[in-house]
Amino acid sequence: MDITLVKSLYREAEKYMDKEVKINGWVRTVRDSKNFAFVEVNDGSFFKNVQVILESSLENFKELCKMPISTSVEVEGIIQPTPNAKQPFEIKATRVSIEGKSSTDYPLQKKRHTFEYLRTIAHLRPRSNAFSAVFRVRSLAAYAVHKFFQERGFVYTNTPIITGSDCEGAGEMFQLTTMDLNNIPKTEEGKIDFSKDFFGSPANLTVSGQLSAETFALAFRNVYTFGPTFRAENSNTARHASEFWMIEPEMAFAELTDYLDNAENMVKFVINYVMENAPEEMAFFNSFVDKGLFDRLDNVVNSDFKRITYTEAVELLQKSGGKFDYEVEWGIDLQTEHERYLTEQIFKKPVFVTDYPKDIKAFYMRLNDDGKTVAAADLLVPGVGEIIGGSQREERLDVLEKRMEELNLNKEDYWWYLELRKYGETKHSGYGLGFERILMYITGMTNIRDVIPFPRTPGSAEF
């Protein structure tokens, strides 16, 4: 007899009613009495468990009643309807074999565990209800991202994880070396001699795939990357991780408004896809993690995102009467408290803030005609703040070179990026979406460590 997934039993219950099935999975609970026992089994294919009825006539009944939680089993039995119970059916077992007995010190017993505790056992937390839901949603959301871009003709491209350039110009990169740290070769000037290193020059883990993606956009028109990025930023907050995943589309012949349209449609698409394909998980989040989750997500997918300039945002915040820890003035980068005030108190929906001061944005963003601002835009959402950052890219070689000089960037490190402007350059735009940020928004989880399988943060690279 073939194995039937528990997901199939729930999705096509009538098809299996009164029929014999075989399942396998892990024991979640055991409740026994003298003549029968109830065992809940989860096979990993579905958020919900299936209840198995054990009768004392089973030859190994006594052994089964003593199964520790997380014991793996194979079950054969008849599907029976349970019209007056919480679950729509149960399995009356005809045979149960123990595949692998769990130790009695299994840490995930039948009680609620804090997310903080579960982070200390990241190798086991996918077995808990909360993280089973989180990581299934993560999988669905990742698929939805690919589905959105593929259906619109975007080419998926892989950009390098090891790079010699700093896309953001912030210098917060993890440096790579194979040199003996106790005997580092030096030049005559006493500096590190990177010519003796593995790549023959300084190398780092990428902070963004954007610059590489731009090269493909100027060949394929519309492309996107979706991969890991790394920031050596010593920020020990609930919103920052040292390793995270980024979605980075780049579109040729596209202005800033084209990026805004694409990003708005993409966010709505991903949310809708998860809501439709993970109803049980989303109901769990709405009940136990964030009781206002459904209302918030419904507001996002059914509203037109507001679009205002940075200057307008500053003026609104200054006139609002709101009390902030960080003073609002033109030229500062908006803090999370400012972003949330705009989305939660003033507009009560997602907001694109555009045309930021050039001095707080990256070198590759297109300079506006005023000479003070750039064609950049961030998407701010209620409950989180910024989840997307992007811009129209600077296609004018002379303007780009001048901007790099202002920031003391070595043009030789970016020779290939500058050369793109020589061979049929065109206006183009793109953006970056931190995948974990949108997962936090969709699930209601408030800490980035709880939406990534094995979080990497300052002082912690366990598992």
UniProtKB/Swiss-Prot annotation:
Keywords: Aminoacyl-tRNA synthetase, ATP-binding, Cytoplasm, Ligase, Nucleotide-binding, Protein biosynthesis. The keyword Aminoacyl-tRNA synthetase applies. This is Asparagine--tRNA ligase. GO terms for molecular function: asparagine-tRNA ligase activity; ATP binding; catalytic activity, acting on a protein; nucleic acid binding; transferase activity. Its EC number is 6.1.1.22. InterPro entries: Aa-tRNA-synt_II (IPR004364), aa-tRNA-synth_II (IPR006195), aa-tRNA-synth_II/BPL/LPL (IPR045864), Asn-tRNA-ligase (IPR004522), Asp/Asn-tRNA-synth_IIb (IPR002312), NA-bd_OB-fold (IPR012340), NA-bd_OB_tRNA (IPR004365). Pfam families: tRNA-synt_2, tRNA_anti-codon. It catalyses: tRNA(Asn) + L-asparagine + ATP = L-asparaginyl-tRNA(Asn) + AMP + diphosphate + H(+). It comes from the Bacteria. Homodimer. Its main location: cytoplasm. GO terms for biological process: asparaginyl-tRNA aminoacylation. Belongs to the class-II aminoacyl-tRNA synthetase family. SUPFAM superfamilies: Class II aaRS and biotin synthetases, Nucleic acid-binding proteins. PANTHER family: ASPARAGINE--TRNA LIGASE, MITOCHONDRIAL-RELATED (PTHR22594:SF34), ASPARTYL/LYSYL-TRNA SYNTHETASE (PTHR22594). It is found in: Cytoplasm. The keyword Zinc does not apply. GO terms for cellular component: cytoplasm. The gene is asnS.
